[in-house]
Amino acid sequence: MIMIKKFEAPVGPISTIVGKSIVLIGDDIDTDRIIPARFLKCVNFDNLGQSVFEDDRKNLKGKHPFDLESNTGSSILIVNSNFGCGSSREHAPQALLRWGIRAIIGESFAEIFYCNCIAIGIPCFTLPKKLVKNIQENKNINNSLCEINIKESTFKSNFFNFDLVIKISSKNMFLSGEWDATSTLLANKKLIEKKINDLPYTKFNQSNELFETI
C-alpha cells in the first residue's frame, strides 16, 4: 500500500492544482467501491484515506492504481463516466481527499458526488471520452507533473494540453474561496456577530425584561 502523506485540508481560494495524475479506468464506479459501507461508522473522516477502494484493492492484490508505487504522491485523478454514482455518502470524496486527491477529471460525474466534492475543495472537470482515453493511455502520465489552471480551465503537462470543462458557478466558488464555508464564516466573524446582536430574540435573551425590545 502507498504511504499517505500528512493530510492538509484545502482552504480559501484555489486557482491551480499541480501534481502527478493517477488513472482509474472504468465506468459507473460507485461510492460503495470508493469507500465500502462498513467504514461509514467512523465518527470523523480522519482515517478514511487508508481505506479508499479497500475491497477493489484487496481483489487486485496490490495491482490497483491506488497501491502502485508509481502513483505515490499523485493528486489528480483521471476517471471515466458516471464516477461517484450510487449512494450519496459524503465519505467517498472525503476518503479521496485524505488519500491525497485534489482534483478529478472525467467524462461525467454523479451529481451528488460532484456537489460533495465541491464542498470540500475538490474541483471536478469533464473532458470528452476520446480525450480522457488519450490521457489514460499515456504511458508517461505517472512520470511528469501536470497543472490544472482553474481560471483558464486548462490541463497541461509535457505530453498534452487540453481545455477542461467546469461549471461556471463552481469555477467562481474556487477562485473566490466561497466553496470553503468555514473560512468564509470565520472571515466575516464581525459581520455575523453584528447580525446576531441585531436580532430581537438575542436581545431578549440578554434581558430580564420580557418586553424590553418591543
What is each stretch, according to the model?
Residues 1-214:
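Fe-S-dependent hydro-lyases/dehydratases of central metabolism
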